Structures are given as structure tokens and as C-alpha cells.
């Protein structure tokens, strides 16, 4: 796996996303006026992200957590640089993001150690995420699904999350059926 990541990375930092668990549940809510209850399916992806510049794996729970932590990691690397400043409805949103970045910084200060990647494959799926640019308040780049050896380009964080979800949607093939 290390050779595949090095070969793919070139000069751009590549982050490996290992998905170790996918859990599904339903969130129920009642519509106004005591009417019918709606059930909305919710899917939670859990795993770790690793970057070749740092020693520790960073755990995440949910795609939102993955995106926020990866964004903080890209800010720390200062590559690729964002082309717009963060905006918020209030200072609390920016402060929360800055606190999350500060919590991650001690983990990001340690240099790369090859032992980190010895158990690098995720139990559900493993992706190599290559963010080339951060323009228009989003990311552009490519993602490679390592188990399937497939690569796709993405034009936004939303499109990246669709690609990750679509790989996790695939049912495992039943080897016993004819």
C-alpha cells in the first residue's frame, strides 16, 4: 500500500481515509400539529485519516467530521491554500473551528512514521484523497478507491462525499452463487 500511495502522490500531499465501520439508524421526527411521524435514515461512517506528513492517525465519526478534520489538516500544511476566508453567522462558528484545529495540532506536529501505515487498510474501504485546489469555498481533486483500484475526479466536497458513499453502498459479491 505504501508504494501505491507514494506512486500516486507526486508533489501533492495525499491523505488516506480508512473506513472501519458504517452504521445505519433512523431518526424520527413528528411533523407539526401532532401529525404523522417521519423516519429519516441516517448513515454514520467511522474511520481514520492518515497523511504522510504526520505520525498519528486521526479518527473521525461521520463525513462532516472527516471533512472538517481534513480541512484543518490542509490549513496546517498550507497546501493547497484556500482562496477564500472562512465565513460564519457569528464568531462562535469560527472559534469552534479554530479550537478543533488547535486540538489537532499536537497530533500534526509529529513527523511521519512508516509504522502508522502497517494496518492502514480500512475494514470497509480505503480511499486515497488528493486535494489539488481549494477554490470557490470547496475542494477539487481526485479520490482513489484502493481496494477496487478505481479513481474519480471531484469538483466539490459534496461530490467527494457522494463518491465515498457510493463506494460504501456496493454490496459484496456472493462467491457461492452461480
Region roles according to the model:
Residues 1-32, 68-137, 167-178:
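Intrinsic disorder/low-complexity detector
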Residues 22-24, 30-33, 37-54, 132-148:
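Short aromatic-glycine-(Arg/Gly/Cys) micro-motifs in beta-strand/loop hairpins
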